[in-house]
Amino acid sequence: MAQNRFHSGTGPSQRQLRVGELIRRTLSDVLLRGDVHDPELNRHSITVGEVRTSPDLKVATAYVLPLGGHDAEEALAALRRNAGELRHLVAKAMTLKYAPQLRFVLDETFDRMDDTRRLLSEDRVRRDVESHPEDDED
């Protein structure tokens, strides 16, 4: 029986990573060119930060964020509404056995980085780090 490597704690396979990156690039190109027949979607500049695929490569989750972070929910709704057309356009540009079902999620990476940066710049954290220097002896 095949293992579900994505959820076993070992992370995605090389094939999942490769296909995810190919889908990310293709989806970015499709959105940049404005190939979708929805003016509401085409008025947004959307960044596709990452695409994660399921182990069987039949589902691809795209982590997206409109440039500037404005109207994120509106852009996400437009992507979800046009998921079928986007799937068709991505499949046409790729040579996979199955066209993956596309799911769209807001990319919160930048928000988490800002939170981490803000936390590390707090005085009490800085004092704590300075009072406990790491041992560099190996």
UniProtKB/Swiss-Prot annotation:
Provide the protein name: Ribosome-binding factor A
Superkingdom of the organism of origin: Bacteria
Q: Where in the cell does this protein reside?
A: Cytoplasm
- Please spell out the taxonomic lineage of the organism that makes this protein: Bacteria, Pseudomonadati, Pseudomonadota, Alphaproteobacteria, Rhodobacterales
Function noted in UniProt? One of several proteins that assist in the late maturation steps of the functional core of the 30S ribosomal subunit. Associates with free 30S ribosomal subunits (but not with 30S subunits that are part of 70S ribosomes or polysomes). Required for efficient processing of 16S rRNA. May interact with the 5'-terminal helix region of 16S rRNA.
List the Gene3D superfamilies: 3.30.300.20
Matching InterPro entries = KH_dom-like_a/b, RbfA, RbfA_dom_sf, Ribosome-bd_factorA_CS
Keywords, in A-Z order = Cytoplasm, Ribosome biogenesis
The scientific name of the source species is: Paracoccus denitrificans (strain Pd 1222)
Binding partners and assembly = Monomer. Binds 30S ribosomal subunits, but not 50S ribosomal subunits or 70S ribosomes.
Encoding gene, per UniProt annotation: rbfA
HAMAP family documented for this protein: RbfA
* Protein family membership: Belongs to the RbfA family.
The UniProt entry's GO CC annotations, sorted and at most eight, read:
cytosol
> Coiled-coil segments, which residues?
none
Example GO biological process: maturation of SSU-rRNA
Q: One GO MF term, please?
A: ribosomal small subunit binding
